[in-house]
């Protein structure tokens, strides 16, 4: 059985800085038995990550972090072991990526009035053919000397409450839960109490997601203070949700260390049992 798993990591195919192969190698060095690759709204990195399993000895749970929106509040869902060819899911991912890029162009236009940044600067940090979003804008701002790191750029310039922010289309989280469940996937609500980065989702919406088939909720996350973790634990008990811990690792530019939080192997075993595709084993 998998002993140490970090079920929330990102590669350069979305907003991380490591290739999927590098990501698995870093996981091996950190003593992890498995990771889940959860790039934003894409499965592009799955094949490369799968090819790295044998020589790294790290098992791979294939997933994605699905962007959603509820009354203007950004919601992130970790989706695991779903059919990547499911038409509804493919369409949601495509539409979200396209609208996010349109939004990014508008945000750069807003920012350029106060910061030395162009769209070409942002594209230099984005994966070729991959999604372009706020992390790549943050990297361009850091490169321009406007902020010391990604985290500072997010808090001071790219926060949803700030003057430069532009909303983009994303599916309703309850509908997204139903969509991923139809694709055979297992869903976990990511960092629901990350107060510095987002407005908080009302508990009533989380309850509706649980009723629609949400499996778990992320408790142990760097952006959750001790009191937030206790609050998530309470919600998990009341709503019958499994509790997860993860790093939300992105590589360089963010302090998150791979494996700094992990998830109980019995919880992961249930994810594997419910998923519709297999885990890639060494």
Enumerate the predicted regions with their spans.
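Polar low-complexity intrinsically disordered regions
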Residues: 1, 281-282
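A short acidic, helix-capping loop that chelates divalent metal ions and anchors anionic groups
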Residues: 88, 254-255
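Short clusters of hydrophobic/aromatic residues that line enzyme substrate/ligand-binding pockets
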Residues: 258
């Amino acid at each position: 059985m998998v002993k140490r798993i970090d079920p929330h990591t990102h590669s350069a195919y979305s907003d991380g800085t490591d290739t999927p192969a590098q990501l698995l190698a870093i996981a091996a060095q950190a003593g992890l038995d498995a990771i889940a690759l959860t790039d934003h709204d894409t499965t592009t990195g799955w094949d490369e990550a799968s090819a790295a399993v044998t020589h790294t000895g790290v098992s791979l749970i294939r997933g994605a972090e699905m962007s959603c929106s509820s009354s203007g509040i950004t919601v992130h869902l970790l989706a695991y072991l779903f059919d990547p060819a499911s038409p509804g899911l493919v369409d949601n991912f495509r539409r979200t990526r396209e609208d996010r890029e349109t939004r990014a162009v508008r945000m750069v236009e807003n920012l350029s009035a106060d910061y030395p940044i162009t769209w070409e600067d942002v594209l230099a940090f984005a994966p070729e053919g991959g999604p372009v979003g706020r992390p790549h804008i943050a990297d361009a701002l850091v490169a321009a000397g406007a902020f010391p790191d990604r985290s500072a750029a997010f808090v001071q310039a790219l926060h949803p409450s700030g003057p430069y922010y532009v909303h983009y289309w994303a599916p309703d989280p309850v509908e997204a839960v139903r969509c991923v469940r139809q694709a055979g996937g297992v869903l976990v609500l990511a960092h629901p109490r990350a107060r510095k980065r987002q407005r908080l989702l009302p508990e009533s919406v989380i309850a509706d997601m649980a009723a629609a088939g949400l499996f778990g909720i992320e408790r142990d996350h760097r952006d959750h203070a001790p009191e937030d973790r206790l609050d998530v634990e309470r919600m998990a008990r009341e709503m019958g949700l499994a509790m997860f811990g993860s790093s939300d690792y992105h590589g360089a530019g963010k302090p998150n260390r791979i494996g700094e939080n992990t998830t109980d192997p019995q919880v992961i075993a249930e994810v594997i049992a419910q998923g519709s595709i297999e885990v890639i084993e060494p």
